[in-house]
Each structure stands twice: as C-alpha cells, then as structure tokens.
C-alpha cells in the first residue's frame, strides 16, 4: 500500500469512529443505545428504544460512513486492494470507535455502504438477501450473518478483483456477531418485531 493509501485508510477509520447512533440519540433526547435495548449503538437498537426516524437517520449515516471514503478513494486512483482496506478501516472505526472508548456497533450498515459501490449487482444482491432472511425469520442478526457469508460469492461473480478484501470485511462482521450466533444456536435470540411489540405493551 502507498503512504497516501495508509493515510486515507486512517481517515476512513476516523470517519467510521463517529457514532451516529450515540450522537443522534443525544440530540433526540433518547436513551444512550449502549445502555438500553440490546446495548448496541446501531440503527436496529435505536428503533427498539423508540426512535423510528432517528433509526432511519442512523442507518443512512452509517451507510455513508462506509460508502463515501470508498467512492472517493476510487476516484483518487486507489487500487482494488487499497479500496478494500479503506472499507475495512471504515468498518473497524464503527466497531472500535476511538471517540467512544472503542465500543461501537456491529458494522452491518457501514459494511453495506462500503461494499455497495463495487456494483449495483452486488448492492442489490446484498439488500435482497438481507430483506428476504429478515422477513422470513424476524432476526436482524441472522440476516446480517447469512448475508455476510454470501457476499463474497456475489462479489466474486460480479467483481472478482474485490473478493479478498470484501471477504475480510465479512469475516469481521461475522466475528462481531459471535454473541448473536450463540444466542441463535440456543434459541435465545429475540426477534426484532417481538421487541417492538413488548415496548409498545
């Protein structure tokens, strides 16, 4: 990697470290997502604690944290491998944010934003897989894990030169969901709409 690419990767990490869930919940007067719901500072948990529009804002911001540095890096002439490392850097920032004591979210939206610019085919396949599994199962975590397992194959089909760096990002996502995987295996993971229903009750 070039010195510029390393510097740019660091900038992507810093952008990823800006936790929109924490900041927007503060602005909206909602509880700290790290201390409420699933204790995960991400869009799904913000939705659980009662902020529909805030959750949508968090989702969009987190996607942009991954998308913008990768897109700009492409036009700056970074290699495929360097772009993959930039995507990984943005995801690492979201998961281990330097501004919030290295305690961040799962990185799903940021990873989607970082991988989506590769091609419309990859973006559509990712989104379609996540939505299908979510509406069938009701588990956000299962949707994320299964999508992460399949994304490298989508990338290999549409843009094979990005397969290795994207696979690294997906491995990071699966690792970040290890607690969810254990709860799913034990049958202890809650469905998203059950939590929303319980909150209304």
UniProtKB/Swiss-Prot annotation:
Q: What is this protein called?
A: Glycerol-3-phosphate acyltransferase
Is Transmembrane helix found in the keyword set? yes
Q: Where's it found, cell-wise?
A: Cell inner membrane
Instruction: Summarize the subunit comment.
Output: Probably interacts with PlsX.
UniProt GO MF annotations: acyl-phosphate glycerol-3-phosphate acyltransferase activity
- What EC number(s) does this enzyme carry? 2.3.1.275
Organism the protein comes from: Pasteurella multocida (strain Pm70)
One Pfam family, please name it: G3P_acyltransf
Q: In which pathway does it act?
A: Lipid metabolism; phospholipid metabolism
Main location (coarse class): membrane
Q: Which gene encodes it?
A: plsY
